[in-house]
């Protein structure tokens, strides 16, 4: 199985990209969540100039964040800096939109966006709509400014539902999901993609998760494991705290953790400004104060924690399910965590 990393965009991220490339990792991504992280295209431009082999991606952008022409120009510009190494990840903007106090895009809007960006990045004209006006648009500055010759890989984010997976199928794109360790769930996503377009090409499947390799006799739910995986657990709790319907689907212990999180952040599930309280520090290393919210059952469900032997067995099972690349977000000591990932999958 291939291995990659995803990080928050910030100054110095290019140094991590260089180290990831030196370790032989396959991809390096940055998030696109403007209200909590730096700009991903600025970050990847630096990474493109500093690296030579590793694939570089956005994980993921959204039609609610950028117009299709603006997004296509950004990706095609990156492709001019790192020809054939760019991954365009696209989703409904579930988190990026919620940090604005808004809801995510619907699947139909997602598909229109992917289609338009694929067309433009492939050097083809596409339909661009603003209200009732529709125009055919194309790059007028193709050449030195952008690269529409080398292919860009397209990947669609799908969490559990089949709609986004079907978009990936119809657009011949890959799939990416976060914290989805259930082989049956992955099988369902792959089937939804295949059923939507049986004859279309299919891209790779990417699993984004957190990883903690246990030392001998280490507590799998101790402070070190919670610090390494807590950002992923907290992302689920923040989503549930922001979305009462999602919280209702959780078990009693998880709902209690959501209640404590809301109380700790001095907000409620219905407060109009709750997003300003729930998302600061999103997908960063958790604080020691929040370790009690990192429930063992959620750690097990969302992250990979175990001895090297245990983890290799689990990863082999995931690979048999059809996952092509394991992507982790290192938060405690990124260079060391990336080295451990490379050693684990060597």
Label for each model-derived stretch:
Residues 1-59, 152, 331:
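N-terminal beta1-alpha1-beta2 module of alpha/beta enzyme domains
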Residues 103, 107-144, 187-317:
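An alpha-helical appendage that flanks or caps ligand/catalytic pockets
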Residues 37-45, 180-195, 334-339:
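Active-site-adjacent beta->alpha loops and helix N-cap segments on the catalytic face
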Residues 3-7, 28-30, 56-59, 86-90, ...:
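Hydrophobic faces of well-ordered beta-strands that scaffold small-molecule active sites
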């Amino acid at each position: 199985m291939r291995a990659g990393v995803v990080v928050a965009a910030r100054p110095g991220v290019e140094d991590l990209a260089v180290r990831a490339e030196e370790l032989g990792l396959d991809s390096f991504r940055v998030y696109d969540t403007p209200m909590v992280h730096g700009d991903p295209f600025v970050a990847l431009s630096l990474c493109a100039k500093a690296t030579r082999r590793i694939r570089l991606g956005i994980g993921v952008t959204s039609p609610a964040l950028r117009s299709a022409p603006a997004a296509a120009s950004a990706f095609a510009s990156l492709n001019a800096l790192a020809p054939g190494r760019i991954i365009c990840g696209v989703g409904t903007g579930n988190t990026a939109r919620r940090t604005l106090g808004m809801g995510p895009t619907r699947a139909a809007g997602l598909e229109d966006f992917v289609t338009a960006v694929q067309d433009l990045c492939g050097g083809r004209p596409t339909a661009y709509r603003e209200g009732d006006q529709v125009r055919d648009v194309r790059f007028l500055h193709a050449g030195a400014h952008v690269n529409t010759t080398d292919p860009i890989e397209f990947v669609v984010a799908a969490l559990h539902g089949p709609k986004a997976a079907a978009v990936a199928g119809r657009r011949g794109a890959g799939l990416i999901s976060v914290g989805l360790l259930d082989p049956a769930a992955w099988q369902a996503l792959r089937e939804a993609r295949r059923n939507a377009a049986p004859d279309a090409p299919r891209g790779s499947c990417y699993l984004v998760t957190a990883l903690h390799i246990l030392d001998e006799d280490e507590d799998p739910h101790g402070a070190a494991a919670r610090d390494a995986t807590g950002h992923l657990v907290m992302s689920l709790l923040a989503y549930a705290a922001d979305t009462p319907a999602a919280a209702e689907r959780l078990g009693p212990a998880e709902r209690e953790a959501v209640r404590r999180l809301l109380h700790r952040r001095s907000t409620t599930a219905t407060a109009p400004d709750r997003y300003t309280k729930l998302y600061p520090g999103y997908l960063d290393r958790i604080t020691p104060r929040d370790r009690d919210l990192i429930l063992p059952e959620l750690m097990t469900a969302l992250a990979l924690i175990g001895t090297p032997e245990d983890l290799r067995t689990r990863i082999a099972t995931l690979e048999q399910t059809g996952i092509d690349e394991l992507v982790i977000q290192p938060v405690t000591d990124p260079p060391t965590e990336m080295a451990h990932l490379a050693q684990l999958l060597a």
